[in-house]
């Protein structure tokens, strides 16, 4: 197709910076010595010494913090009280939940969970055996006429 106007670059030929200022502007990372942490061991070493902690290069170099060993870390598998109420209703239909004094007895470890959280609403009286529970979960279970019993459990 025929072009109606000349491209702007045609007008800028011969002007050295093509309208981008006096010296060395409108470049990518060349004007700043490289992207990111490039050059911290070479031409930007003075920045590392100036802004790093006591001339050691921290926080730019070295390892920071620690990673907890898998042997002692806990893999939490939580369930909310609202979801637990639905699960108990399903187990009741299947006849897989025990009743004790008009309350349903549930062991969360047997169901594959190890923490009870307070999300949702519960309207069933449930006795819950669990290794850990949040304060709001305990309050909601007790308000519905149930009870939370904390049991020791081996994690993982």
Curated annotation (Swiss-Prot):
What are the protein's UniProt keywords? Ribonucleoprotein, Ribosomal protein, RNA-binding, rRNA-binding
Q: Name one GO molecular function term.
A: rRNA binding
**Any single Gene Ontology cellular-component annotation:** cytosolic large ribosomal subunit
Compositional bias (Basic residues): 1-16
> What residue stretch is flagged as signal peptide?
none
- On whether RNA-binding is a keyword of this UniProt record, the answer is yes
Name its GO BP terms in alphabetical order: translation
Q: Name one Pfam family in it.
A: Ribosomal_L27A
The region called Disordered is annotated at 1-35
Name the domain of life this protein comes from.
Archaea
What's the family?
Belongs to the universal ribosomal protein uL15 family.
Q: What does this gene product do? A: Binds to the 23S rRNA.
Q: Describe the subunit structure.
A: Part of the 50S ribosomal subunit.
Q: What's this protein's name? A: Large ribosomal subunit protein uL15
Species classification = Archaea, Thermoproteota, Thermoprotei, Thermoproteales, Thermoproteaceae
Gene, per the UniProt record: rpl15
